[in-house]
UniProtKB/Swiss-Prot annotation:
It comes from Geomys bursarius. This is Alcohol dehydrogenase 1. The keyword Protein transport does not apply. Zn(2+) 2 binds at C98, C101, C104, C112. Its EC number is 1.1.1.1. GO terms for molecular function: all-trans-retinol dehydrogenase (NAD+) activity; zinc ion binding. Transmembrane segments: none annotated.
Length: 375
């Protein structure tokens, strides 16, 4: 029996208040309005940005259903939707692409003005929610809201992908993999034969290492305080691994000494202010490029000596690896299907959705790279 046009009752993980576990609840998901799409989520990844909401580092209205990295199948569409149809495999886009705003039209920009990133309204574009639970409206997250068996997104926040692609793997392209990989190949524009460093070897950092390798870097130095991550980093392309705790000097000085004055490209993937500065300082002073990938805490400010930049270093940042979702995500899925890069080594656990809190415990304990939840 068709569910189009009807309210769907399904399971979702609701965060009622910060610093509390997720609660598996039955929620009601309203039908999509005009230019909206309702998606049956098949697989969704647990991202550290979701945990930043749980611990209060990222502010978003609560109660909310989090989740922003997923793959699913279109269940129904609202009036006026033309780019997807029921039955299509899709990836929701937490960075939308309207194609009309100034950012979307610029070839080097991807921050569509309609995105919820940074504004944290917790609603769809019309200012309302499609979720209710126990008679109360529940907020969306980043316009995609994937910790729910069904979700509703704006048409500009979803893209169709290869019908044969495995959603439990390509869901990583919805955030973490693209963020790291694109930071290397698209934002940093790593050059063949160059020297790169990546501060932190978590899932996004490993994806940046994959990107550096794909771009032809000659040396890729992984920096992490957890030596257990080094084997995986080397498996995916790191040529050297460095633990800052093994030295009695700042890590940027260690890297400068290892590379005859500094690396050509560095990537900060933690989101700490001190490591952002360190990643910049480890770059070669006349031409080094440092890319901020990690999400910093709210209301934090950096103080820098401008001479560090005046000498010739460049400091860049990007969200979602600089990718335009509708244009680039289908291409990334196609590249994965063509075996141009791996995703499997990044997935350490596949859990049923009900084990979401166990997945977050593993993330916080540093015992997982990526946990994927399946419905």
């Amino acid at each position: 029996m068709s569910t189009a046009g009807k309210v769907i009752k399904c399971r979702a993980a609701v965060l009622w208040e910060k610093n509390k576990p997720f609660s598996i609840e039955e929620v009601e998901v309203a039908p999509p309005k005009a230019y909206e799409v309702r998606i049956k989520i098949v697989a969704t990844g647990i991202c550290r940005s979701d945990d930043h909401v749980v611990n209060g580092s990222i502010i978003t209205p609560l109660p909310a259903i989090l989740g922003h990295e997923a793959g699913g199948i279109v269940e129904s569409i609202g009036e006026g939707v033309t780019t997807v149809k029921p039955g299509d495999k899709v990836i929701p886009l937490f960075v939308p692409q309207c194609g009309k705003c100034r950012a979307c039209k610029h070839p080097e920009s991807n921050l569509c003005k309609h995105g919820d990133l940074g504004r944290a309204q917790g609603t769809l574009m019309d200012g309302t929610s499609r979720f209710t639970c126990k008679g109360k409206p529940i907020h969306h997250f980043l316009g995609v809201t994937t910790f729910s068996e069904y979700t509703v997104v704006s048409e500009i926040s979803v893209t169709k992908i290869d019908a044969t692609s495995p959603l439990e793997k390509v869901c990583l392209i919805g955030c973490g993999f693209s963020t790291g990989y694109g930071s290397a190949v698209k934002v940093g524009k790593v050059a063949r034969g160059s020297i790169c460093s990546c501060v932190w070897s978590g899932r996004v950092g490993l994806s940046a290492i994959i990107g550096c390798k794909a771009a032809g870097a000659a040396r890729i130095i992984a920096v992490d305080i957890n030596k257990d991550k080094f084997a995986k980093a080397k498996e995916l392309g790191a040529t050297e691994c460095v633990n800052p705790q093994d030295y009695d000097k700042p890590i940027y000085q260690v890297l400068q000494e290892m590379t005859d004055g500094g690396v050509d490209f560095s990537f900060e993937v933690i989101g700490r202010l001190d490591t952002m500065v360190s990643a910049l300082m480890c770059c070669q002073e006349s031409h080094g490029v440092s890319v901020i990938v990690g999400v910093p805490p709210n209301a934090q400010s950096l103080t820098m000596d401008p001479m560090v930049l005046l000498s010739g270093r460049s400091w860049k940042g990007a969200v979602f690896g600089g990718y335009k979702g509708k244009d680039d995500v289908p291409k990334l899925v196609a590249d994965f299907m063509a075996k141009k890069f791996p995703l499997e080594p990044l997935i350490t656990n596949v859990f049923p959705f009900a084990k979401i809190n166990e997945g977050f415990d593993l993330l916080r304990a540093g015992k997982s790279i990526r946990t994927v939840l399946t419905f």
